[in-house]
Amino acid sequence: MQKLLTYFFLLMFLLQTEAYAQSEIESIKKSISANTIFIRHALAPGFGDPPDFTKEDCSTQRNLNNKGRLQAQLIGDYLKKSNLLFSEILTSEWCRCIDTAKELDIGQWETFSGLNSFFEGHEKKDTVMAKLRKKLASRKPSDLVLFVTHQVVITELTDEVPRSGEMVLYNSITKQKSRFMVDF
């Protein structure tokens, strides 16, 4: 009987913990009426990209390591449990962002050049940001969109500097924002 009670209380604790975790991101979303969630790609050791960078060749890029893949999977698990429904999932054309989107495993995604990094001049900042702003302006404010991108893109739009795997919930109308990190 004692063992049964122990299991019961452990189960109740786990259910409460999960319910809290699920409601935290939903609460933030609701508090600012976020219609966009930016996520910086998961852990990819290093800085920038190698000198021989080619967008179409992942071997010339800084990529996710095993810890980064695990991080993206755990973020995906968290998002699945949160019951957030994304009308669209878009990712930068960089391999570390594409791999993050794949590892999230939360739905169909497409690449979008309006999320590409302009750090080190591989893309033109004005071009990238114009595409992103046009995308934000062209959709229904009630739709929730997930963008997998780079720190420079998120910072340029929101003035936030997210860590790898960190999310910035954003209201594209009011410009309100809030950062959120799934610990792993």
Can you name each region flagged by the protein language model?
Residues L15-S23:
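Bacterial Sec-dependent signal peptides at the C-terminal "C-region" and cleavage site
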